[in-house]
């Protein structure tokens, strides 16, 4: 079961930059509200799955922060160096969390 939760978490986390692009490309308040609901839904989902079932508090905080870094990276793409740097951090941290999660998946 821990493998299913791990891959779902990574998949959902990977959707944040895509959703940020949608937010940037449309100036609609409905999209803004939807993004806020998705962010809070992600935090609740990550907290329930990772903390309650797996007791991985550090990975939970890292995953939530990584989602925000990717989100902010796409939002800042028009400010040249900051958006690119945030997206590079997002990719490196994402690989690190995936490797660490797979390494310790049996402890979940």
From Swiss-Prot:
Protein's name according to its UniProt entry: Putative transmembrane protein ORF108
Superkingdom of source: Viruses
CC annotations in GO: host cell membrane; membrane
Swiss-Prot/TrEMBL keywords: Host membrane, Membrane, Transmembrane, Transmembrane helix
Regions crossing the membrane: 11-31, 33-53, 69-89
Membrane topology: Multi-pass membrane protein
Subcellular location: Host membrane
